[in-house]
Amino acid sequence: MKLNELMQAIPVFTGEASETIEISHIAQDSRKVKPGTLFICIDGELVDGHQFASRAVELGAVAIIAEKQLDVSIPVIYVRDSKRAMAMLADYFYGSPTQALKLVGITGTNGKTTVSHLVEQIVRENGEQTGLIGTMYRKIGDQILETKNTTPDSLTLQETFRDMLLSGVSTAVMEVSSHALVQGRVYGSDYDVAVFMNLSQDHLDYHHTMEEYANAKSLLFAQLGNSYHTSNPKIAVLNADDEESVRMQKATAAHVITFGIKQQADFKANNIRITSHGSTFDLRTPIGNFTLKIKMIGNFSVYNVLAAIATSFALHIPMEKAIKTVESIPGVKGRFELVHAGQEFPVIVDYAHTPDGLLNVLETIAEFAEKRVFVVVGCGGDRDKGKRPQMAKIAVDYATNPIFTSDNPRSENPRAIIEDMIQGVPYSDSYVVHENRRDAIRFAVNEAEAGDVILIAGKGHEDYQVIGDEVIDFDDRVEARIAIEKKLGLA
């Protein structure tokens, strides 16, 4: 593609977009530059891409997008916002793939991963080829690809959408993080349905205030645009029980569908019954009433199912198909996942890493726990420190046997993180501390008896632990199974 054609994606810029320069590749990482590359300088949180412009030229870049003045031997085009420009250029370069896809974006503090998997499976069961982008992986049809972020950078994102189209995908479902929205990674993506789950404290190390965090989430709904007079109107699916849904609704001109348990909603659950094996509830919808029996446990699971069914309705999938699918799904890896190895007590691994997420899971466990509740919990390093005492307080208030441990300490001292947690529970001596996460899991398993419940919280599906600059193999589910087998004399 000629540079002058590609630059049609950007309405205002400074510099000459030559009609003779051929662009075969776009990169923001100088290590990925090859002959024919348009190199985009991003001034990021850790690294300023402008510092690598000369290196990009050496590697074969033929033009550069920048915000700051550069002294290089190839054409430089200057823009106000390189991140936004990169997203728009990526969309244009890869043929605006989301205009040919049905695209669903799901945002919120908790529930994104589960809802995205539920919606993807519902659409797949309806006979469509699907794509999925989220915390655990990217999926194109049956192909699984690794992912580093919940929402990839805009270049990777648009390339993935292009690959989905080439593979016959018709509907893509993706998690949309607040970081991605603020950083402009999803600019240029044409969403058909946007879903808001909830908002509670998380990522304040980045957003600083809950107001900024909420505003970040609302960007997804502002991006839906105004489609009242089109044959395929955009739809916002909102949690009626979360007060921030008002903000999301104000941010969009799209149609709104609501779901909830407490407030009036288009998709409302009544008569919820929770057991250790699943949940049942009556569902009221715009097209009739239904009774559901799902294999997932807890009110938070009911919210996730409501969101998935409301989204399926927005995608014109038959209600019976959506209900049958969600009733057949046992859950998502690392989300209230049971570890069975012959023990007499349930061991649950869950990704709960926010105060609200931990509270939801512990409240659910309280519905069926017969005796003691053990919770193994830590907090991530180099992340929102404000939630550490809150996590500890919830663990102490809602579990009989809290065990404070390491999560992903990253560059911080694990003991210092635990000390931050303990600041939230000066009134309690019910907790114990095992800094080593493996030791904490083994302690819980060895102490537990029939009728008790163990929750291992915070890491869920993750199969690694980040300690300093080292990433080590570590999976809560594997560690729990090993501990159980040792206790039972099976290992």
UniProtKB/Swiss-Prot annotation:
InterPro entries: Folylpolyglutamate_synth_CS, Mur-like_cat_sf, Mur_ligase_C, Mur_ligase_C_dom_sf, Mur_ligase_cen, Mur_ligase_N, MurE/MurF_N, UDP-N-AcMur-Glu-dNH2Pim_ligase
Catalytic activity field: UDP-N-acetyl-alpha-D-muramoyl-L-alanyl-D-glutamate + meso-2,6-diaminopimelate + ATP = UDP-N-acetyl-alpha-D-muramoyl-L-alanyl-gamma-D-glutamyl-meso-2,6-diaminopimelate + ADP + phosphate + H(+)
Residue span of motif Meso-diaminopimelate recognition motif: 407-410
Residues involved in ATP binding: 108-114
Record keywords: ATP-binding, Cell cycle, Cell division, Cell shape, Cell wall biogenesis/degradation, Cytoplasm, Ligase, Magnesium, Nucleotide-binding, Peptidoglycan synthesis
GO MF term set: ATP binding; magnesium ion binding; tetrahydrofolylpolyglutamate synthase activity; UDP-N-acetylmuramoylalanyl-D-glutamate-2,6-diaminopimelate ligase activity
Modified residues (N6-carboxylysine): 217
Binding residues for UDP-N-acetyl-alpha-D-muramoyl-L-alanyl-D-glutamate: 30, 149-151, 177, 183, 185
Enzyme Commission number(s) from the entry: 6.3.2.13
Binding site for meso-2,6-diaminopimelate: 383, 407-410, 458, 462
Listed cofactors: Mg(2+)
Subcellular location, record wording: Cytoplasm
Top EC class of this enzyme: ligase
Signal peptide: none
Gene Ontology annotations of biological process type: cell division; cell wall organization; peptidoglycan biosynthetic process; regulation of cell shape
Record NCBIfam families: murE, PRK00139.1-2, PRK00139.1-4
Entry function: Catalyzes the addition of meso-diaminopimelic acid to the nucleotide precursor UDP-N-acetylmuramoyl-L-alanyl-D-glutamate (UMAG) in the biosynthesis of bacterial cell-wall peptidoglycan.
Protein name, per record: UDP-N-acetylmuramoyl-L-alanyl-D-glutamate--2,6-diaminopimelate ligase
Species, as recorded: Listeria monocytogenes serotype 4b (strain F2365)
